[in-house]
Amino acid sequence: MNTELTSRADAPLVLILGLGETGVAAARWCAREGARLRVADTRMQPGGLEGLRAVLQEAQVEYHLGCGSHFDPALLDGVTQLVLSPGLAPGQEPAASLLAAAVSRGIEVLGEVELFARALASLAEARAYHPRLLAVTGTNGKTTVTALTRQLIEACGLSARAAGNISPAALASLMEALDQDALPDVWVLELSSFQLETTHSLQADAAVVLNVTQDHLDWHGDMQAYAQAKARLLKMARVAIVNRDDPLTLAMVADVNGLNVRSFGRDLPQRVGDMGLELGQGVAWLVACEPSDFDEPVVRRKKDAPPPQRGEGRMSRLMPVDALRIRGVHNALNALAALQLARVLELGWGPMLRALRDYAGEPHRAAFVRSIGGVDYINDSKGTNVGATVAALEGLGQTVVLIAGGQGKGQDFSPLRSAVSRHARAVVLIGADGPAIGQVLESTGVALVVAADMREAVRRAAEIAQAGEAVLLSPACASLDMYRNYPHRGQVFVEEVEELALDRGEVL
């Protein structure tokens, strides 16, 4: 650390607002760059406090903890830059008033990802470091696509780091790479709408918006603001990739040069560079629209050369959907998005498709736990919004007993009606907004059961589900009313499923 520079009285003073994972990374980076630090958080014991104290001496940081519902404007005194945590909504208190005061004083407001973008620009100038950069956003599927894209890239012999919302924070990963003298060939960033609000100068080779459905309306205020936050990413990318099935993402590229747009979807692709699904003789395939057979060598272009004309091309079958280890149509679409991102780097199909076959998915995302009595148990605890749960219901291809409920975050639950009517035998309701979901689903005629906790939910679901069906935990809600986070909720589900198996004498 640049402790000498950090302690200089004339060094710039940076205010870190919010001390979660990204706040700690930003604080460490700013200290490394020679800034003085002031840190403020609404909590007395924010999650990143111990981590920051472990790497920075107490004298290097001015702490203001337990600020509660109000940040004192005096926090801005002497500050040249304010780094905002993605956990604090800029349009809501306690951050809104302080941010307005910062802007009126001419203090720059930015986020950790913007600092990362500027760090890459500095490294390009100082060390001629010019990595490729791919970025992923969307309501659902971000982590799966980010992790899978990294795996595809590494299978082709390039080094890659996945960072951002997926964890670790982008700056934390960059500092680790610098310290290890192991800067990667490619960065793959998962970016939330929160992070994009404070990012302005990222330069991506390609970026994808996977989908936009209701989520985080308690943070953004309305769907328009939420979609606009996602759309910001495509304006910072050379190639914009969107979901043809999602009108909101298609609208984001309405004014973009078509040569710089790629798309994926459930239907057959029509233009060179697009991807989709083909149902042939009862077998679903991942397909790409290519100008030539995919086993021919790729003609390399100069980096800044415009992409070729996107005319109608030749359909290439890549692999059967059933060959994927990740389940559901939504995951087939995630696979297409990852392939498109990696394909922008002009990587060959062969290694990527082999890596795609091997990819087993991420924890708590439509993850198969086990079968008991012919019933599959699926952990989709990461399904924290209505869109994710609809995707899981429609993608599994099984009748399910759904376990849903938790903190609803101000969502409209009505989009669940159609998917539940078509795919669910029953719904077991848990958590604070379980009753609200039940109220919406009453008109479907699907059986509704209320459970006090996960143990009861799993047991009641097991009583209802029939052989060949699935018990699906996909809550459509956040978890904090009952659990530490969604991984904790998923782990409790897995434990209860394993306990059920033991009780029934089924041991793996």
UniProtKB/Swiss-Prot annotation:
One of its GO terms (biological process) is peptidoglycan biosynthetic process. One of its GO terms (molecular function) is tetrahydrofolylpolyglutamate synthase activity. It catalyses: UDP-N-acetyl-alpha-D-muramoyl-L-alanine + D-glutamate + ATP = UDP-N-acetyl-alpha-D-muramoyl-L-alanyl-D-glutamate + ADP + phosphate + H(+). Pathway: Cell wall biogenesis; peptidoglycan biosynthesis. One of its GO terms (cellular component) is cytoplasm. ATP binds at residues 138-144. It is found in: Cytoplasm. Keywords: ATP-binding, Cell cycle, Cell division, Cell shape, Cell wall biogenesis/degradation, Cytoplasm, Ligase, Nucleotide-binding, Peptidoglycan synthesis. Cell wall formation. Catalyzes the addition of glutamate to the nucleotide precursor UDP-N-acetylmuramoyl-L-alanine (UMA). Belongs to the MurCDEF family. This is UDP-N-acetylmuramoylalanine--D-glutamate ligase.
